[in-house]
Amino acid sequence: MVARVWSLMRFLIKGSVAGGAVYLVYDQELLGPSDKSQAALQKAGEVVPPAVYQFSQYVCQQTGLQIPQLPAPPKIYFPIRDSWNAGIMTVMSALSVAPSKAREYSKEGWEYVKARTK
């Protein structure tokens, strides 16, 4: 009984995390124009390090542990605008030709099997 409840809880937690991620991507319009994607990435770069520092300070206060000071993350310039839409276009292009390629490959496979059985 406990195993079933535990597996159900794991499923619900994983589903909630996945649903939250999908909602966040949709709400922030991350699959839309690259301007919004780049702005969201920049916003995350500004917000996440202070949040991690604040959380580590909270953990130190609650547990009494001393967490060593981490070095500052390097500043990396990656022009996401140049590659984001290209990646989306490539994936969508591959998905659009998948049915015809599957038909073509299955036809070739069928011809191969027919040739081998003769």
Curated annotation (Swiss-Prot):
- Superkingdom, natural source: Eukaryota
* Listed GO biological process terms: cristae formation
Where does the chain cross the membrane?
8-26
| Topological region Mitochondrial intermembrane | 27-118
Q: Secretion signal: which residues?
A: none
Compartments where found = Mitochondrion inner membrane
GO CC annotation, single: mitochondrial crista junction
The UniProt entry, under InterPro entries, shows: Mic13
Q: How does it sit in the membrane?
A: Single-pass membrane protein
Keywords in UniProt for this one?
Membrane, Mitochondrion, Mitochondrion inner membrane, Transmembrane, Transmembrane helix
Q: Which residues does the entry place in the Mitochondrial matrix compartment?
A: 1-7
| Similarity section | Belongs to the MICOS complex subunit Mic13 family.
Tell me, in a sentence or two, what this protein's role is. Answer: Component of the MICOS complex, a large protein complex of the mitochondrial inner membrane that plays crucial roles in the maintenance of crista junctions, inner membrane architecture, and formation of contact sites to the outer membrane. Constituent of mature MICOS complex, it is required for the formation of cristae junction (CJ) and maintenance of cristae morphology. Required for the incorporation of MICOS10/MIC10 into the MICOS complex.
* UniProt cross-references to PANTHER family, sorted A to Z: MICOS COMPLEX SUBUNIT MIC13 (PTHR31816:SF3)
Q: How does it assemble?
A: Component of the mitochondrial contact site and cristae organizing system (MICOS) complex, composed of at least MICOS10/MIC10, CHCHD3/MIC19, CHCHD6/MIC25, APOO/MIC26, MICOS13/MIC13, APOOL/MIC27 and IMMT/MIC60. The complex associates with mitochondrial outer membrane proteins SAMM50, MTX1 and MTX2, and with HSPA9.
Task: Tell me the protein's name.
Answer: MICOS complex subunit MIC13
Per the record, the gene is MICOS13
